[in-house]
């Protein structure tokens, strides 16, 4: 249950914004970072693998042992390529591709050989140098190729085991004629036979004793050299004979059954097509995981080459992800900030106009503003308007687990910008790496962040004066930035991107309506909608237009009417009305009187203060934001930048009007419905006493600054002091102010009992009252004398009890 007033922001919000001390949530841009190149060379000598210790026998011997030799060789060499002509760079691509900062953009062959990836790890001067030999992507390629080789080998030679198969006793394969196999079967010398089509493998019964095998095998006569080789391996290996069955001869299964010979097909568990396929799939999965973690753009001629595009050129330099080009015509409501950046773009396009007058471009421009005000949109407009390379990065991409990686990326980033000068570097959310190093905003020291910041400071102050490289930084926390980064020479300009005023909001609405080609109804006036949206940022207005279009489409309308925009504003402020959750019984009656109390007190305040808006709508339909009721007071038609003391007192009384109505109607039996009202009133009263200096006892003192011990050059407090007695005094004054506001609200409610009860009953029945029906009741409201005294600032002697106590 809340009372929501769309009045202009309070003065303290404006002051905090102007000093860039807002701690609002951050606005993140999907950007990227550069990753430092590492050139490498990889040459692997051929490795020879003799499967199962095959033995080379003379070809003249009929039973010569078949030799199995496999030569595996892997080599990787990559060629350098020149940088492309397109010039919008996303640093995340650079991070994922790891391009060489020293080798890019060189078309000369001699220069291209330097730091090349096809070099060995030693230099031409025969001096050993350590360089990374292999990268994650190439490990995956090696695994994939190795898996393919093993798969092909297993298909060709099914007897060879693959990695992951069951361990086997080392075996020596000997090839013999098929006639010898038949002879051994007939002589009952065969123990086991494995038949795989025309290929037959068999083992003799005396395989355990090599000497016996040699003497009993009459049909297999080996030379002396072969016998010597067999004796050297026989104690640890078994002998398996292989042969090939002719097509017109059958396998002697009857004789093998008669001799109790164990026969069957080969054991496929150690290989076979299925297991080989699983192994290959495993290697492919490993490669896919590596490529997902370290993506590679195969469309480029070089793996580490940064993808570039010409901004604003014929190639369609488009920054946004959907391919849409952003220009300054798409930016509205921030004319001052746009003018500053247009001057920078003009300098890059026509530098002679400024150079002949002795002017130099600003080294850096820092964009500061609340989230949603358009800092990133301005940077995109610069990329779309400028005809120079535009490199965008997020500051968080510079920070890595390993110390030194961030500084390396900063060096690569600025090295590329210098090569392509004139160019622009945009670093979004720069406070991620540029926080103050004095420990005030860092509870724990971080060497990686400090080294990255030091490298950033060095690069920004080390530009050649003739190279037009401009750095754009964006942040909504300028108060935490290191002073060394904000000084002239690094960030020469600090551009504040503020929330738009009424004219700016109208311009923003026109831009979004025209871009979406939104069909508007005849009753839509964008100027009036801009008046209803005081305090909205550019992002809020863009969302408002989209919500209005969605609401119109939900009702199958052909145009977007004014009522759609009004409902969209209400959704943005109070949330979405719940369709199923409805208040019933006593709760519904309490909420109706509560909202009627806000309306009665707010109308009484508006009658005493000129230029104040009146209540236009009451609702007791629960909303998604948790509010059970809704009182809508539109903002004034003109933007307000100051809040006077009488207006502040009037807001306090209006906020506590709902609680006062509950006390009067239900004779002190109050509910918890005033939770949000009390929070907002307490915050407003505390700032009036402790920050605005609107209390006579405290005086014009900033309690926070006094308690902290002053403000240093960076805008923070150097040390803190215990000011317990001052805090107690502030708490007492805040309590007195809130109690006085509640007492005044009670007097207003008691002065208008008929209006309170009649309006509350109608709201309870209809759940929503607005327009002429609401104004009929509110026109009968009469302000009390105590309200007039309180609004004028005469806080003392409001009630007899307070007068006697004072």
Swiss-Prot record:
Coiled coil segments of this chain: none
Cofactor binding note: Binds 1 zinc ion per subunit.
Protein location: Plastid, Chloroplast thylakoid membrane
Domain of life: Eukaryota
Assigned EC number: 3.4.24.-
Similarity field: In the N-terminal section; belongs to the AAA ATPase family. In the C-terminal section; belongs to the peptidase M41 family.
Protein name in UniProt: ATP-dependent zinc metalloprotease FTSH 9, chloroplastic
Origin species: Arabidopsis thaliana (Mouse-ear cress)
């Amino acid at each position: 249950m809340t009372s929501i007033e769309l009045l202009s922001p309070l003065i303290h919000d404006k002051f905090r914004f102007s000093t860039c001390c807002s701690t609002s949530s951050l606005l993140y841009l999907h950007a990227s970072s550069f990753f430092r190149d590492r050139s490498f060379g990889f040459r692997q000598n051929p490795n020879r693998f003799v499967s199962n210790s095959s033995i080379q026998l003379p070809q003249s011997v009929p039973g010569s042992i078949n030799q199995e030799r496999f030569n595996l060789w892997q080599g990787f060499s990559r060629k350098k390529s020149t940088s492309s002509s397109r010039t919008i760079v996303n640093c995340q691509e650079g991070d994922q591709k790891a391009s060489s900062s020293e080798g890019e953009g060189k078309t000369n062959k001699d220069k291209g050989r330097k730091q090349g990836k096809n070099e060995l790890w030693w230099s031409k001067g025969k001096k050993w140098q350590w360089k990374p030999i292999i990268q994650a992507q190439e490990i995956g390629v090696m695994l994939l190729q190795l898996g393919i080789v093993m798969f092909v080998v297993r298909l060709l030679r099914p007897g060879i085991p693959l990695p992951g198969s069951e361990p086997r006793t080392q075996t020596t394969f000997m090839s013999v004629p098929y006639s010898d196999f038949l002879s051994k079967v007939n002589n009952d010398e065969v123990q086991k036979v494995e038949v795989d089509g025309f290929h037959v493998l068999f083992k003799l019964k005396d395989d355990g004793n090599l000497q016996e095998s040699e003497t009993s095998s009459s049909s297999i006569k080996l030379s002396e050299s072969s016998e010597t080789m067999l004796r050297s391996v026989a104690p640890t290996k078994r002998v398996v004979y292989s042969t090939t069955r002719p097509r017109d001869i059958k396998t002697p299964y009857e004789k093998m059954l008669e001799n109790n010979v164990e026969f069957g097909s080969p054991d496929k568990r150690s290989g076979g097509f299925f297991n080989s396929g699983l192994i290959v799939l495993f290697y492919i999965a490993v490669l896919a995981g590596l490529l997902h973690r370290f993506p590679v753009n195969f469309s480029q001629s070089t793996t580490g080459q940064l993808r570039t595009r010409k901004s604003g050129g014929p190639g369609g330099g488009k920054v946004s992800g959907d391919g849409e080009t952003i220009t300054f015509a798409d930016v509205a409501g921030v004319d001052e900030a746009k003018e500053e950046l247009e001057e920078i773009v003009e300098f890059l396009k026509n530098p002679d106009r400024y150079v002949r007058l002795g002017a130099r471009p600003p080294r850096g421009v820092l964009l500061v503003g609340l989230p949603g005000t358009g800092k990133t949109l301005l940077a995109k407009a610069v990329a779309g308007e400028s005809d120079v390379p535009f490199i965008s990065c997020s500051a968080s991409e510079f920070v890595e687990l390993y110390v030194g990686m961030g500084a390396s990326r900063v060096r690569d980033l600025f090295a590329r910008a210098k090569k392509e000068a004139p160019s622009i570097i945009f670093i979004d959310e720069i406070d991620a790496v540029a926080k103050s190093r004095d420990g005030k905003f860092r509870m724990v020291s971080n060497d990686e962040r400090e080294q990255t910041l030091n490298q950033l400071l060095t690069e920004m102050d080390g530009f050649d004066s003739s190279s037009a490289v401009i750095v754009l930084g964006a942040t909504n926390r300028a108060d935490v930035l290191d002073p060394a980064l904000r000084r002239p020479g690094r960030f020469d300009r600090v551009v504040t991107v503020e929330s738009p005023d009424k004219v700016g909001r109208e311009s923003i609405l026109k831009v979004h309506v025209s871009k979406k080609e939104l069909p508007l109804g005849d009753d839509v006036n964008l100027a009036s909608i801009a008046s209803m949206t005081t305090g909205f940022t550019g992002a809020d207005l863009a969302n408002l237009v989209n919500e209005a279009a969605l609401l119109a489409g939900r009702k199958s309308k052909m145009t977007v009417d004014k009522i759609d925009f009004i409902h969209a504003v209400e959704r943005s402020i109070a949330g979405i009305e719940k369709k199923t959750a409805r208040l019933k019984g006593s709760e519904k009656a309490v909420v109706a009187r509560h909202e009627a109390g806000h309306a009665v007190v707010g109308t009484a305040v508006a009658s005493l203060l000129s230029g104040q808006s009146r209540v236009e709508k009451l609702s007791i339909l629960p909303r998604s934001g948790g509010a059970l009721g809704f009182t809508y007071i539109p903002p004034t038609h003109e933007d307000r930048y100051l809040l006077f003391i009488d207006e502040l007192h009037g807001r306090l009384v209006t906020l506590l009007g709902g609680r006062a109505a509950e006390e009067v109607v239900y004779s002190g039996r109050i509910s918890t419905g005033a939770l949000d009202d009390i929070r907002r009133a307490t915050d407003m009263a505390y700032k009036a006493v402790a920050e605005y200096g609107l209390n006579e006892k405290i005086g014009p003192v900033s309690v926070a600054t006094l308690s902290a011990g002053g403000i240093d050059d960076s805008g923070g407090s150097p040390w803190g002091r215990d000011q317990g007695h001052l805090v107690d005094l502030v708490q007492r004054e805040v309590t007195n102010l809130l109690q006085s506001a509640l007492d005044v609200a009670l007097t207003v409610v008691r002065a208008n009992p008929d209006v309170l009860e009649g309006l509350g009953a109608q709201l309870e029945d209809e759940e929503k009252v607005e327009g002429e029906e609401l104004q009929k009741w509110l026109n009968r409201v009469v302000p009390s004398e105590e309200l007039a005294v309180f609004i004028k600032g005469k806080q003392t002697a409001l009630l007899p009890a307070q007068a006697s106590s004072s």
